[in-house]
Amino acid sequence: MGVVLPTLIVYAFLLFFSSSSAASLQRPSGGLGQGKKEIARSGLPGQIVDQKRLGGPGSVPPMCRLKCGKCEPCKAVHVPIQPGLIMPLEYYPEAWRCKCGNKLFMP
């Protein structure tokens, strides 16, 4: 009885730590939009950068074909929507727009 209890405690710790380390090493195999590459607008006007983002509701880019009129190429971009406040904010909601040249169009 004196050896059984410490042995059980050692096995419990080994089981706990091995399962927690395996869970932390495991990579997600697919959630909503993981690893999707999309085009996002940076804070500077006119600059567009590629970045990886996690998807969520509304994260699918719109079909921009025929949305920019005769202007080509018409591409979907993520842009911050700035409220009409005088003081700049640190966070702006984002929305999809269709961009051709320097013009943005509603999708």
From Swiss-Prot:
<feature type="disulfide bond">
    <location>
        <begin position="71"/>
        <end position="100"/>
    </location>
</feature>
<dbReference type="InterPro" id="IPR039455">
    <property type="entry name" value="EPFL"/>
</dbReference>
<feature type="signal peptide">
    <location>
        <begin position="1"/>
        <end position="22"/>
    </location>
</feature>
<comment type="similarity">
    <text>Belongs to the plant cysteine rich small secretory peptide family. Epidermal patterning factor subfamily.</text>
</comment>
<keyword id="KW-0732">Signal</keyword>
<feature type="disulfide bond">
    <location>
        <begin position="68"/>
        <end position="74"/>
    </location>
</feature>
<keyword id="KW-1015">Disulfide bond</keyword>
<comment type="function">
    <text>Controls stomatal patterning. Mediates differentiation of stomatal lineage cells to pavement cells and stomatal development inhibition. TMM (AC Q9SSD1) functions to dampen or block CLL1 signaling. Acts as a growth-regulatory ligand for ERECTA family receptors. Promotes fruit growth and fertility.</text>
</comment>
<comment type="subunit">
    <text>Interacts with ERECTA.</text>
</comment>
<dbReference type="Pfam" id="PF17181">
    <property type="entry name" value="EPF"/>
</dbReference>
<dbReference type="GO" id="GO:0005576">
    <property type="term" value="C:extracellular region"/>
</dbReference>
<feature type="disulfide bond">
    <location>
        <begin position="64"/>
        <end position="98"/>
    </location>
</feature>
<dbReference type="GO" id="GO:0010374">
    <property type="term" value="P:stomatal complex development"/>
</dbReference>
<keyword id="KW-0964">Secreted</keyword>
<dbReference type="GO" id="GO:0010052">
    <property type="term" value="P:guard cell differentiation"/>
</dbReference>
<protein>
    <recommendedName>
        <fullName>EPIDERMAL PATTERNING FACTOR-like protein 5</fullName>
    </recommendedName>
</protein>
<keyword id="KW-0217">Developmental protein</keyword>
